[in-house]
Structure formats: structure tokens, C-alpha cells
From Swiss-Prot:
Record key words, sorted: ATP-binding, Carbohydrate metabolism, Kinase, Nucleotide-binding, Transferase
Protein family according to the UniProt entry: Belongs to the anhydro-N-acetylmuramic acid kinase family.
Function: Catalyzes the specific phosphorylation of 1,6-anhydro-N-acetylmuramic acid (anhMurNAc) with the simultaneous cleavage of the 1,6-anhydro ring, generating MurNAc-6-P. Is required for the utilization of anhMurNAc either imported from the medium or derived from its own cell wall murein, and thus plays a role in cell wall recycling.
Keyword presence, Amino-acid biosynthesis: no
This protein's name: Anhydro-N-acetylmuramic acid kinase
Known catalytic reactions: 1,6-anhydro-N-acetyl-beta-muramate + ATP + H2O = N-acetyl-D-muramate 6-phosphate + ADP + H(+)
EC number from the UniProt entry: 2.7.1.170
GO molecular function, one term: ATP binding
Any Pfam family the entry gives: AnmK
Pathway(s) the chain acts in: Amino-sugar metabolism; 1,6-anhydro-N-acetylmuramate degradation; Cell wall biogenesis; peptidoglycan recycling
Signal peptide per UniProt: none
Binding positions for ATP per the UniProt entry: 9-16
CDD domains cross-referenced by the UniProt entry: ASKHA_NBD_ANMK
Amino acid sequence: MYCLGLMSGTSVDSIDAALVKITGENVDLEIELLSGINHYYPEKLRQTILEVADGKPLSMERLAELDEEIALCFVEAVNKIKQKYSTVALIGSHGQTIYHRPPFKEKLGYTLQLGRGEIIANLTGIPTVNNFRAADIAVGGQGAPLVSKIDACLLSHPQHHRCVQNLGGIGNVTYLPPKEEKNWENRIIGWDTGPGNILIDLAVNRLTHGEKTYDNNGEWAAQGNPHSQLVEQWLKQGFFQQTPPKSTGRELFGEAYLEQCWQDAQVYNLSETDFLATLTELTAASIAHSYQQFLKDPIDEILLCGGGSHNLYLKERIQSHFPSTTTVKTTDEVGMNSDFKEAIAFAILAYWRYVSKIPGNLPQVTGAKQARLLGDIHLPLNS
């Protein structure tokens, strides 16, 4: 079955569209990536999304308009794929997160992804699954990370302890025990590790007055020196001490957090390059800190994916926190495209919801009280 996954993350850099051929049943799947593209938001729309995600108030009327505008951009991404592949049978659309609140004590969490699935289905003529996180949250889960079950299916190793570390705007990890070990499936865990690219990207945007949006290959940060005392200070923040299940987003690690980091850096008179190096070090150190706190077994391989996997300086800094017996590489090196891995995941989640009708979440990862079917199904007109 030809399934198209659509994903736009907290960085709001583009809509990732990945067309995959899925064969097999339930969790015994084979995946072939046929096409992957990045479809960019118009800059004005992107800025609006970022402002809303950072807490700018807007009317319900404007929210409804924004929901539709985002859906139409997702439709454009689908149509680009359809120009070459007319046999797309199913769409899994994550949508665009503009708000995420983890559960707290007895209070359920809440999440809001814009980009109406019914519009995508009707305008493309393809059944569409969206709103994947809500069902997990409704039974007490974090609604994230949702990729862990897919990581287990596609990236587990018979003998190696692996961590699949996504480096999108926010970082998240899936720990995969060796498949040959007893009850390995029940020992899979995952959580959000903290900032991935988000603080680095926001800082680059600030320092270049909007001319650049990311640090290409980490070349700018690599010219500086990270300030270890400042990193240690930042790691005392409450989220880094919180035990999994846990999730986060721009609500915590956004513009306001960057401003506080900037003010902290002024105390030490850091240069721009040292500031970027220190933010990069925070991402690397928070990952290492997280593993050391919450994982019992030594890790054989760390598999990086997402936009940050291209940041060579970040990759180097992550490796520096682990012994030489732990290999840091990208998922590309084990056969999984690192740029489109998240989009591929939502194609699979849609397949599980629409075709296999099996749960997509792992309760031990999200904290949900039970496994649930994830996503709302939207059928096109006249179907």
C-alpha cells in the first residue's frame, strides 16, 4: 500500500512529505521510501505560526482561518507527490503543533495540531488520518513521543542496545533493548530529552536579524567554546530532572527561554560564537544527562535523525559525552532516511489505524493507561 506521511515539527521549517510502500501486517512491516520532499510554508504564514506557538493571542476567527491555511499548505505538499505518484492510497498527517501541555497530577494534558484532516481528504481525494496524539492524551498519556513503536519495528538490533535520538526542534529518544533478550518489547522506553535544534535556530535567527534560520553543519558554533558552568546551570532546570514519561515543546523551550539564556550569557560576556557553542552543548549534554539518569544499560549505538543529525558539531559534542564503545551515527547508516523518518512514522501510524486497526502508542513510553488506536479518519467526498 502506498502511504504518504506529512509532518511539520516545532521548528516550522517545512512540511516533510514521505511516500512509502508498506507491505506486511501489524508490526511485521517492510518499508520502502519512494519519495521525500520538503514543502516550505510562505514566510508570512510561518511567522504567524511561530508567533502563535510562542503564545501570541489570536481570535477564534483567526484560529479557524489559520487551521485552514495550514491544511491548504499540506494539500500542496500532497499534490507535489501526486504529480509523480498517482497511486497514493492513504495519508497520515501530523499537522502543525501550536500548543502542547503535558498532563499534570490529575489534570489531563492537551495538544493542538492545526491543518484540518477533512480538508486534506476532500481536496486530495485520499483517505486521511490525523489528530494522532489526542487518543493517547485522553487516557492519561503525554501524547508524545509517538514514534517509539515504529522505532522498535524498524530499528531494533538482535544484540545491540540502541538509542534512536531525534533532533528536531525538540529532542526525543527511544531506547531499544536487544531483540534477542527476553521481554525486550516491554523494556522499550522513550521520552523528550529537551531542546534539539530549537534554541540554536532561534539564536541564529536573532544574531543574524532573520537572515539565517539555522547553523549550517554547526560551523558557526564550532568556532566558539562552550561555557561548561553555564550548561551545568541550565541543566538544573526542572524538566531535565523530571522522570519519564515526559514531553515538552516551544511552550517551555521557546523565545522566552532563549531570552533567559541570553541574559545568563551576558553575565559571562560570551561572544556570539561562544553563545551558540554553549546552546549546542546544552542539547548534547541534556541528551547524555538524560541517558545517564534514566537508562540502566550501556548504550552500543546512538542513531541520530531529524534536522540536527546534519549538525556535525552537535554530533561531535554528543559523542564526547559517551565512551568510545558507544557509536554515534545517523539512521541513514542503518538504512532509515534521517530527514524523513518522522514523516515515515506518521505514514505507518495511519496504516496501523486505517488498515491494521492496531494501537500506535506504547503506554510505557507515553504514560497512557492503555494502548489505543491513534488518529481520526477522514474519508474524501463520494467515497
